């Protein structure tokens, strides 16, 4: 499965530290890597491609790029959730289960967790209010 890492706050050589953290977890995802950094947070990701092999690079954003997602796992009911979110007006750029999480969080906030079926761990950074939501499956 994929791997994610990150830290908050300012540190010396932030980009180098994040790159090193991401390299340490290369065995979790050899197919690609992704990064997100701003003044408050740094997140890294290693991807093992399973679904939507060409379009699943992370981070994943919502439509206006106010929410940033790093995700590890598999959401079994993502097609059902995607359909429901699409009917509510959400616009999807990929066919990934990852993108369902960011739009689901945008729509339902923490209640998203009660709708998910699968195995997962993820972090969502809200750039607007500078809050971090981290969750994992119940098992």
Could you tell me what each predicted segment is?
Residues 1-139:
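N-terminus-centric sequence/structural signature that marks the extreme N-terminus
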């Amino acid at each position: 499965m994929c791997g994610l890492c990150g830290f908050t706050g300012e540190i010396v050589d932030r980009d180098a530290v994040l790159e090193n953290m991401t390299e340490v977890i290369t065995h979790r995802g050899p197919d690609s890597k992704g990064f997100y950094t701003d003044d408050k947070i740094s997140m890294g990701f290693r991807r093992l491609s399973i679904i939507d092999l060409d379009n699943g690079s992370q981070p994943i954003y919502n439509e206006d790029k106010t929410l940033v997602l790093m995700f590890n796992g598999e959401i079994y009911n993502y097609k059902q959730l995607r359909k429901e979110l699409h009917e509510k007006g959400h616009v999807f750029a990929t066919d990934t289960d990852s993108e369902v999480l960011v739009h689901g969080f945008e729509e339902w906030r923490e209640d998203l967790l009660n709708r998910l079926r699968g195995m997962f761990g993820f972090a969502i950074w809200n750039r607007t209010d500078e809050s971090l939501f981290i969750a994992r499956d119940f098992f």
